[in-house]
Amino acid sequence: MNFLHSTLDRLREFTPVSNTSTFRTNGQITPEEFVAAGDYLVFKFPTWSWADASPTSKRASYLPAGKQFLVTRGVPCHRRLDDDFAGEAGHDETVVGDGEDFRGTGHSPGDDEDGWLRTGGLAASQEARARDVRTVDESGEMGEREDDEDDIPDMEDEDDDDEAIIRDPKADNANSSRRTYTIYIAYTPYYRTPRLYLSGYLSSSQPLPPHLMMEDIVGDYKDKTVTLEDFPYFSNNIKMASIHPCKHASVMKTLLDRADAALKLRREKQKQGKTVPGAKDTGMEGLVDDFEKTKISDKKAMLEGLKAGGNGNDEWEVLQHDQDFASEEEEVAIRVDQYLVVFLKFMASVTPGIEHDFTMGV
C-alpha cells in the first residue's frame, strides 16, 4: 500500500499547475497563495523559515527560488502513541467528515474512511467532577470529599528508598522517550494543498529510523493516511513520514465554513447588544477573536500577536479582516494568507504527541 501511494504521488507531481483561486469554494490554494501563507507563517512565527531545494535541480518551477518549502526544527515529542491511544486522559475519539460539525459525536475511526479522527473529548474538569463523590447527611449538608482509593498511600510504596536505588545513567539515556522532529511543509500541485513531512531524531540527536516515526502517529492513520515517502526537494532520498493530502482541502473547507458561521453569529449578537465586553464565548463563537492587521502585501507591518478566543480549551484560532480591508458583507473569519496557521492546528490531530504549538509561540 505504501509503495502504491508513493508511485502515484510521483506521477501526480507532473500535474499542470492551476493559478485560479478556489480557496473559498473548496479549500484549495494556488502556488501564489501558498507563498503568501508561508510568508505570513514565517513573519508571525520565526521558528518557521523558507528553504530552497538541494540541489537546485530539484526546484519546482511554480515556486520562487528560496521559497520551495517551509521548515522548522527541534520540535519536541515526549511520548509514544500505541494503537489504543484516544487522547489525553482517555478522551473519546470522534471523526470529522466532509461538511460535518467538528464537534460531532457518535462515530468511531472505522465508521467513515473518508473522515479525519479528532482525539480528545472529556475535559479534565469534567473528569474531576466525575470523581468528586460526596455524601449528604440527614440535615442536607454536603460532607467532605472522600479520598479516592488511588489517593490512599500504599505501605509498600514506603518501603523503597529512592536514594538507595542505584540507577544506570546509560540505561536511562537509552530508554529516554524524548524525541525531536524537523517538520517540512511542501506544496502539492495535484491536490492543490500543503503537505506535511516529518523527520525524527532520538534524544541522542541520532536520526530516527523511519518505521519508528509511526510510533508517534495515531494508530488509525498508520499506513493509511500517513506513509513513508522521499522528500521531493532533496536528492539523497531521505525517508520521512508524510501525511497524505487527499482530504486536506475538504476538511479545511469545513473549518472555513464553520468559522464564517461563527463570526456571522457573533456580529449579529454584537448588533443586538447581546455580547458582554470581556466575556468569553463558548463553542465555535469562542474561536472568533478580532484583531487588527494589514494586508500581507503591506511590508511595513503585519501582526503584533495572535489572540485566541474561546473557553481556554479551544484549539482553533479564527482570524478575521480589519474593517479597512473589506466591507462587513465580505468579512470572513480566515483569510487565505492565514491558511497555514489553521492547517498546522488540523495536522496536530494526527500527531498529538508532537508539540506543534512549540513552533507557533510568539
Swiss-Prot record:
For this protein, the record's InterPro entries field holds: Atg3/Atg10
Location comes to: Cytoplasm
Q: What is known of its domains?
A: The N-terminal region is involved in phosphatidylethanolamine-binding and is required for atg8-PE conjugation.
Q: How does it assemble?
A: Monomer. Interacts with atg8 through an intermediate thioester bond through the C-terminal Gly of atg8. Also interacts with the 40 amino acid C-terminal region of the E1-like atg7 enzyme. Also interacts with the atg12-atg5 conjugate.
Task: Name the domain of life.
Answer: Eukaryota
Is RNA-binding included in the keywords of this UniProt record? Answer: no
Q: Which organism is it from?
A: Sclerotinia sclerotiorum (strain ATCC 18683 / 1980 / Ss-1) (White mold)
List the molecular function annotations (GO) for this entry: Atg8-family conjugating enzyme activity
Instruction: Spell out the catalytic residues.
Output: 246 (glycyl thioester intermediate)
KW Lipid metabolism (keyword) present: no
Pfam family for this entry, one: Autophagy_act_C
Q: Which GO terms describe its cellular component?
A: cytosol; phagophore assembly site
Alphabetical UniProt keywords: Autophagy, Cytoplasm, Protein transport, Transport, Ubl conjugation pathway
Q: Cite the record's Acidic residues compositional bias ranges.
A: 138-163
Q: What does this protein do?
A: E2 conjugating enzyme required for the cytoplasm to vacuole transport (Cvt) and autophagy. Required for selective autophagic degradation of the nucleus (nucleophagy) as well as for mitophagy which contributes to regulate mitochondrial quantity and quality by eliminating the mitochondria to a basal level to fulfill cellular energy requirements and preventing excess ROS production. Responsible for the E2-like covalent binding of phosphatidylethanolamine to the C-terminal Gly of atg8.
Official protein name in the record: Autophagy-related protein 3
> What family is this?
Belongs to the ATG3 family.
Q: Where is this region: Disordered?
A: 85-164
Q: Name one GO biological process term.
A: protein transport
> Region annotation Flexible region: residue ranges?
84-168
> Basic and acidic residues bias: where?
85-104, 128-137
The segments labelled Handle region in the record are 250-338
